[in-house]
Amino acid sequence: MFSRSTLCLKTSASSIGRLQLRYFSHLPMTVPIKLPNGLEYEQPTGLFINNKFVPSKQNKTFEVINPSTEEEICHIYEGREDDVEEAVQAADRAFSNGSWNGIDPIDRGKALYRLAELIEQDKDVIASIETLDNGKAISSSRGDVDLVINYLKSSAGFADKIDGRMIDTGRTHFSYTKRQPLGVCGQIIPWNFPLLMWAWKIAPALVTGNTVVLKTAESTPLSALYVSKYIPQAGIPPGVINIVSGFGKIVGEAITNHPKIKKVAFTGSTATGRHIYQSAAAGLKKVTLELGGKSPNIVFADAELKKAVQNIILGIYYNSGEVCCAGSRVYVEESIYDKFIEEFKAASESIKVGDPFDESTFQGAQTSQMQLNKILKYVDIGKNEGATLITGGERLGSKGYFIKPTVFGDVKEDMRIVKEEIFGPVVTVTKFKSADEVINMANDSEYGLAAGIHTSNINTALKVADRVNAGTVWINTYNDFHHAVPFGGFNASGLGREMSVDALQNYLQVKAVRAKLDE
């Protein structure tokens, strides 16, 4: 299926934990890859530092696996502490010499907009790389790339709109504030939306004048490395964006603890987020954390049922359920519960699961063997806890990390499948009698990332939205993102916001200036 260099060997992956590390003295900086849809491209293999692809200091590499075939795609260079050091020094020089933060803000915006245009011109290949690397359906990857393009363009428009204020302190003094960039920002992105999270991280950092050292997820580094080739073409100076591929315990730790990094942004699990928060606190670094979720999706009896079912489908099975804000806890008003279960079961069983390059596929592969095993483990936990398996719960096929859409009924609120984030296409369905009851159930969680409300009564929708503990509430829709709307969580779901003007505040600090005037 794939053409590889002689250094990229076809193997079978039993788990992501089996990623093989190898030493190559002459691994080329690009390898040719032919995609399943017939497109061909050159995949960068190096780290991206100072606007160049470079080998890692130790020449160590690791393999990248295709989740839908369990075959190796290629090897890329593995960054380590000394590579992070080189990237941080490059970013620090770029910040100190003013090549980015010292230029006209309009020029920063133009460069970011140009980067979006270059991605747009190559979006078919980029979407295909995302599907190859992550296993998600090609339709989802195309949607991701469109979101990337729109967000970069939107962010570019904020470049010349970062201002301070003049403060009237009397005739004897002139007082004002200005908002300034922080410096070098460390960014750590997940494997479920590799390129979209790359954009969510770099755009607000760059438009505010910061420089970046970014770690890709070890299982999905390809798309971020590929689009990095467009960074110099966009007019972004050397050292402004640096990409170090590698493992969390090495590269992630080095980024989090580096004294020259002033802020850390992370998307991933709550457990890892807590660790990063504690480590960053030791260096008094700013943090943005977009973490886990166990989001409620509420269906009232007056909802238009067929539309509600489709929204619930999108809420849990989109991106193979590997979404931090997935609507994995569904609550249905008692009077329509049986009818809902009937329609939701049928809709779940009709979903096309399989080859992610097939245009009719809605749910592709899980990203890794490890994640598939975790999901199947939770299916067993649900059965053992006494929940009713309504449909699914089985691996699909013998090759590739596929699982059938899975629905549990007859659940209790203290069950692990209700409380814990599964991060896959597994959903629980519970009945409720009143708005007060469902709000209490929805809020009975350590998380607070998102919620969905389905009703034809706008009063009900707005009142419930106000009382649900969630950073984002969708009404009669779900997983409905827009670059102008902020995204982030409450409680154990994180700190700070992604997207929109709100994201910019995470990358700025306020300076107050007060001058005494001559009499």
UniProtKB/Swiss-Prot annotation:
Tagged with keyword Transit peptide: yes
Modified residues (Phosphothreonine): 216
InterPro entries: Ald_DH/histidinol_DH, Ald_DH_C, Ald_DH_CS_CYS, Ald_DH_CS_GLU, Ald_DH_N, Aldehyde_DH_dom
Active site annotation, chain numbering: 290 (proton acceptor), 324 (nucleophile)
Annotated positions binding NAD(+): 268-273
Record-annotated membrane-spanning stretches: none
Gene Ontology terms: biological process: acetate biosynthetic process; ethanol metabolic process; lipid metabolic process; NADPH regeneration
Organelle transit peptide: 1-24
Highest taxon of source: Eukaryota
Reactions it catalyzes: acetaldehyde + NADP(+) + H2O = acetate + NADPH + 2 H(+); propanal + NADP(+) + H2O = propanoate + NADPH + 2 H(+); propanal + NAD(+) + H2O = propanoate + NADH + 2 H(+)
Assigned EC number: 1.2.1.-, 1.2.1.4
Principal location: mitochondrion
Cellular localisation: Mitochondrion matrix
Keywords recorded for this protein, A-Z: Mitochondrion, NAD, Oxidoreductase, Phosphoprotein, Transit peptide
Site positions per UniProt: Transition state stabilizer: 192
Other remarks on this protein: Present with 22200 molecules/cell in log phase SD medium.
UniProt record similarity statement: Belongs to the aldehyde dehydrogenase family.
Function (record text): Potassium-activated aldehyde dehydrogenase involved in acetate formation during anaerobic growth on glucose.
Identification of the protein by name: Potassium-activated aldehyde dehydrogenase, mitochondrial
